[in-house]
Amino acid sequence: MKRFTVNKSLVINGKDAISFVDSLISNSLKDGMPKFSYLLSPDGKVNSWFIVYQAGSEIFIFQDNDKLIQIKEFLLKYKFRTDCNLDLIDVQYSFAI
């Protein structure tokens, strides 16, 4: 088993956050359950993989710092008429994978 340690997370919150993210990733969100997922392009191709975690009305995406910036930019392309915020935050978290 390996450890995956991150020091940043992309946090998504707001009224439409869950439906917005759920429509763009490969696995359905489930509150309190971290899981691997993929960000899919409109044609269904894998754009990025990451760990996603839903905590109530907030969603946290964990990946390397450079990838988080790319994921945020990708999500912002599809965030029109959607009430949610996307912010990079500092965290200290480690996953056993």
Give the predicted meaning of each segment.
Residues 1-97:
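Basic, glycine/lysine-rich polyanion-binding surfaces/domains
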